[in-house]
């Protein structure tokens, strides 16, 4: 939990796109774990984005009979606006746990990759030409067509669920990695990402379907 709360300085991107799950892992020691009161933490400097993400995820948990609260209603502004010491983080974790929270779900950006795609006529990729002349003849149009190269970003985002009552190396219940491609609009991205998280948790039987 110390590590989790200390990543509050990392930017959490919620802004539209295509959301794809990349990987997921569930702690085999928590196969029957069912969260009852969840603190939802969206790591971002953008307060609007944070509120939208946490509120949307809270609504999804509530619809499944799980008590959930947004971190902006729990954390003091001084906690998220400044870097915390380990002692201060421990105190906040204890305060949250003492208030009845048994779980925390936190999401943060782990990295960003810039990609390049070429837009133009389609070329055969399933055949190898054995003569240079034939190869060059067929592909020389790349010099003359109106295709272009376009850059876009892929954001690698991680969501993790922790058991606050453990508060040790075994407290991680579930973690999943997602890729969000070239986000544009905040509302659509948040909806897509939250839905992806919920589907993952349902698949692992951590939460029930509606």
Describe each model-derived feature in a short phrase.
Residues 1-5:
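Positively charged n-region of N-terminal signal peptides that target proteins for export
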Residues 8, 108-111, 180:
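Residues that line or immediately flank small-molecule/substrate-binding pockets and catalytic motifs
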Residues 12-15:
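C-terminal motif of bacterial Sec signal peptides marking the signal peptidase cleavage site
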Residues 17-36, 138-210:
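C-terminal/domain-edge helix-coil "capping" segments
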Residues 35-37, 101-102:
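A general structural motif
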Residues 45-114:
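N-terminal segment of the mature soluble domain
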Residues 87-160:
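Surface-exposed short loop/turn segments
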């Amino acid at each position: 939990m110390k590590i989790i709360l200390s990543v509050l300085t990392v930017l959490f991107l919620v802004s539209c796109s295509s959301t794809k799950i990349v990987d997921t892992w569930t702690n085999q020691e928590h196969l029957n774990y069912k969260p009852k009161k969840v603190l939802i933490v969206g790591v971002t400097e953008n307060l609007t984005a944070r509120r939208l993400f946490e509120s949307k995820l809270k609504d999804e948990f509530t619809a499944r009979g799980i008590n959930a609260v947004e971190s902006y209603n729990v954390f003091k502004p001084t906690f998220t606006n400044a870097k915390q010491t380990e002692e201060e983080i421990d105190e906040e974790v204890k305060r949250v746990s003492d208030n009845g929270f048994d779980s925390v779900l936190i999401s943060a950006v782990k990295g960003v990759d810039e990609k390049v795609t070429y837009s133009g006529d389609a070329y055969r990729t399933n055949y190898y030409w054995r003569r240079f002349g034939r190869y060059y003849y067929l592909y020389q149009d790349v010099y003359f067509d109106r295709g272009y190269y376009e850059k876009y970003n892929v954001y690698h985002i991680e969501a993790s669920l922790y058991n606050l009552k453990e508060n040790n190396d075994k407290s991680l219940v579930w973690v999943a990695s997602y890729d969000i491609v070239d986000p544009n609009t905040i509302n659509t991205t948040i909806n897509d990402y939250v839905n992806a998280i919920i589907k993952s948790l349902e698949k692992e039987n951590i939460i029930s379907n509606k």
